[in-house]
Amino acid sequence: MLFFQQSDFLDRDNLPDFLNRRGLKGYGVEVGTHRGDYAKVILEKWEGRRLDCIDPWENSDAYKDQAVSLWGGARNREEDYDAAFKNLNGFGERVRLIRDYSPQAANKYQNNSLDFVYIDGDHKQVAVACDLWAWYPKLKTGGILAGHDIVCPGELPDKNWGKEIQPAVLEFCKMFNTTCYLIVESLCLPWSYYFIRS
């Protein structure tokens, strides 16, 4: 089986329109909301009822390691939470900010209850694998499990997250015998991906 195929749309900013076309307009989750920038894009375009934004917004050792890789140093996570609140406050009851770690948060949702989940949290391989396994059962049949930063190892040497995320996604594809659709974005690279729950 061919595990990776190119998506029929470009750029993750078009994911909300894709969800709308598929009639996925109920409940969604974003894991790793950070400052709320992508959650805002989702909420502006997606016709769904509510998006839960999950992020611990705390300075863990794992976060500090990623922060050095992404921004050259650690950031104040409380400032990130405040920015997310400011970015998303105008959406009212369509959004909830939930301070929690992803696998623990997933346990609070019923199986077969969500239309989509977008994963952009901890980029370490084991964490990505845990997120995929934790959230996949929460999707309705036909729901979308998507994520960010699957850039192929070596394509952007100064950004090391692809070497962690891609193996976790490939293993997940093999275990579920499913196709991963790659969403081409900037630099003609597949930054985002998604699965359709069968």
Task: Report the location of each language-model feature.
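S-adenosylmethionine/decaboxylated-SAM
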Residues: 2, 6-8, 12-198
